[in-house]
């Protein structure tokens, strides 16, 4: 007789072979689990535990995945995992009958079963279900990783999110919070009488942001098209058309680098409100993020990237000139000459990008970008950006070198970007042409010229406030995730060879 070898001691390939043989045997008996089409259940693990006092002794039906099996004599204890958590099953030969119990003993960890039984507590006070009937609903042909105690290799976790969710149930909470955040944000805007809309993902011009686009080809039209890098320009066309409050939650695609805060495919919300300005957008940004934290987490206090963050309303607001003066020691408000500004930046170790014009505005922004962002831990609105880096933004009436723009920073991460939108088509054309010149100098992230958008503006666009918020980063903030991949179910990964 062949020696019995526990599956845990078998090689991976041997375990797979044994599972396939068990499936073949079931099918030969006319018990193919894959022919099961439905299982009616009336309970789940969380509800049973939460309502034990009223459910004790009651008959229940539940379904889930077997995550452990202990004791293989006449009694077996198992952990059943469903969408709400785990609960112990008490499986006894006297309850199932010898024939069914022997079949049950052949079930493997990872198999999906339906259970009918009675709620009770064991002698050790563990809330459990005494199984009266166990039905195999799906056979797992592959064993769970690392002896089912968890999957820790991040590369495998992100490539096989289905296994990650299976063996690391806490991972699901990130995506529950993500769903709740999007729901909160949608309700917030709907209650302000915004209309949710959908705009094209494929466009003949990539506009609305400074980013390198993905390019694809439309076979029927025989033209190259760009996957959207923002939803700004089509949404502003709707403002021109008389839809005074619009927003879109959707995927954005940017053919750029990947790091803990960036994924080429990400989700944002963009919103535009006629007869409003960037101050109104600040209030909405603060209201969404702080309000979501309070509703979803029950607190304004969160921990992210090793920092304790207070999201309570009343966020700090400072101009870029003020921020650079405080953290870099240069008062750009006292400088008017381009060469002097560039020299002052260089003296602090700040270099302008090769493709950037050597101007006061570019020097101010370079100082902020390279020296200030790292200091912005608590929620802060940085306002009044240079016109050079804000091609779609209304100029400041007080200083035409600056624009009515803000970015929201938390823990040195940009969370949102908003403007008093530029509605002067003549000024907009001039700024587009500056962007075209930058592209010609080698900046492939500069804006493209969009003649149709300019045409729309020439019909008259009301004063408008607009904003974009990165949903993935907001979820990182609320969950404490240290990488964007933890809050995207299927992050972009390089294929394995």
Language-model-detected regions and their locations in the chain:
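Class II aminoacyl-tRNA synthetase catalytic cores and aaRS-like
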Residues: 1-497
